[in-house]
Amino acid sequence: MIKMAVKFVVVMIVFAQILAPIAEAAQGKAVYYDPPYTRSACYGTQRETLVVGVKNNLWQNGRACGRRYRVRCIGATYNFDRACTGRTVDVKVVDFCREPCNGDLNLSRDAFRVIANTDAGNIRVVYTPI
């Protein structure tokens, strides 16, 4: 009986670890901005290129600075064939996207290109904290 209980607990822990990232994933829209990626709200001048600015709901009065997200394109916001590349990109929050911000995530052009065709301009994404 104890052996079965231990197996059950182990199985539950494994499922929790597998499903936790899925539960934290959010969907939203992403746009991009062109370089130079300087004068960011978090770090001033910085050299990283896989970066993102976030909207107010993610910004949390600057507490978002330094957070990392894994972002995946799931489709174009507008009718645009083959917007997504099928890849993911890991980005670091370095900026605040002030209203009117056209996306939940304002990706650097370099980051956007990893996951989507820049001609799409505005895409639907899934993003997960990492």
From Swiss-Prot:
Location within or outside the cell: Secreted
GO CC annotations, alphabetized: apoplast
Domain Expansin-like EG45 stretches: 28-130
Tissue specificity remark: Expressed in unstressed leaves.
Leader peptide range in chain numbering: 1-25
Stored PANTHER family: EG45-LIKE DOMAIN CONTAINING PROTEIN 1-RELATED, EG45-LIKE DOMAIN CONTAINING PROTEIN 2
Function: Plays a systemic role in water and solute homeostasis.
Protein name: EG45-like domain containing protein 2
